Amino acid sequence: MNMLGSMFSMVKPRLDDLGTDRLNYYYSTLIIMGMSLTITARQYVGSPLQCWVPAQFTKAWEQYAEDYCFVYNTYWVKPNDKVPLTVEERVSQQLIYYQWAPFIMAIEAAFFYLPVIFWSMLSTKSGINIIKLVETAQKAEGAESEERKKQIDIICRHISNNLRKRRNEEETTKMAKIQRIFGMQHGKYITNVYLVTKLIYMTNSFLQFYSTNKFLGQNDPYWGMRILDDILKGTDWEHSGNFPRIAMCDFQVRVLGNLQRYSIQCVLTLNMFNEKIFLFLYIWFLLVFFVTLFDSIFLCYNMFSSHKLVEFLQQFLDNQDQDENDEKKPEERKVYRKEQHSILLSEFCLHKFTPDIIILLKMINNHTGDIVCTEIVGRMWNEFLERDAKLVLQRFVDNDHHMETKSSSLKSEKLFEEQRSFI
């Protein structure tokens, strides 16, 4: 109980998440911990099972029998079937899950939270303080004009410094090997760590689904659908055997030096809760897995498609208002927008933004909305036009001229060869 209480206080929404992350590390963890606490309270505050004992049993004997049966398992027999004669047959039909259910759920909740710990530990080594920058963006969202400009400047300066650092710095820390593996020097460290975290989320939900099936002794991966179908059709557990409410229990007591064996019938009130809880978890694990899978595919498409990358940044440039920089150079701005806009936009999006910066912008956009991101991208666009636009356009003209010269040279050589051939 203390462990679950401390986990409840530790699990909080984070500012460095996207899409389905919160569904995994936050909502799943809290939901499963809540279920674990519910079953724990039912087990240790109420009566987990009650047994029908022989009339000669005293109150102490009855309590002993119920405690023994709760600890050492029960076995299920269909109402119209005979009780198995051999111990081996009875053991093969044992119900071994109900007393362990709250502990298994606590472990499941912990495993849903582990991936975000992995993400938190490695993402902080990138040089980009994502949480701090998102907090700054949130301050800018609700600030007045001057304070807003100041907060936006802080974010833009941090991004620019990170871009310069990635180009010029050779990593020499203890994390250097891990950072190289995850693409630190190419501005892909956060992106790769984040995608690995997504993979861990999916692996976790799939393994949770598989291990829960094994824990319940179900060899059919569709058992959840069968139970749901039984509930909807009104099929009684007495016929299906799913989470039986009544089970048998065998125990021995020593009376006057002799061992006497008793077989008693017990009511498993816990299984009323277990049936609904594990059916919910069956559906939940599948839902989380597929939602995370589709979200990861969608993210990869948006991150590694040049078209979607340009489209992502273009939406903010389209939203931005004309600032003082536009008013100072209206003619130049107009030329850029009409004639060379595609060249500059392509250079700006594909070469001035690393995947890590794109992930950062997506997280800022996720927690603050379009307005702050519009100002950040707009500010960086205007700085790009001031500092790099002429150089980019000149390089494009030079390359174009070089290609024309090369094409003319090839044509001349071809004509010369044709003339030689004719002669």
Swiss-Prot record:
Keywords, sorted A to Z: Cell junction, Cell membrane, Gap junction, Ion channel, Ion transport, Membrane, Transmembrane, Transmembrane helix, Transport
Keyword Membrane attached: yes
Membrane topology: Multi-pass membrane protein
Assembly and interaction partners: Heterooligomer of eat-5 and another innexin.
Keyword rRNA processing: no
Transmembrane domains' residue ranges: 25-41, 102-122, 277-297, 341-361
Cross-referenced InterPro entries: Innexin (IPR000990)
An MF annotation (GO) of this entry: gap junction channel activity
Family, similarity comment: Belongs to the pannexin family.
A Pfam family that the UniProt record links to this protein: Innexin
Organism: Caenorhabditis elegans
Reported tissue expression: Expressed in pharyngeal muscles.
GO cellular component, one term: gap junction
Protein name, as recorded: Innexin eat-5
Gene behind this protein: eat-5
Alphabetical GO biological process terms: monoatomic ion transmembrane transport
Annotated localization: Cell membrane; Cell junction, Gap junction
Its job: Structural component of the gap junctions. Required for synchronized pharyngeal muscle contractions.
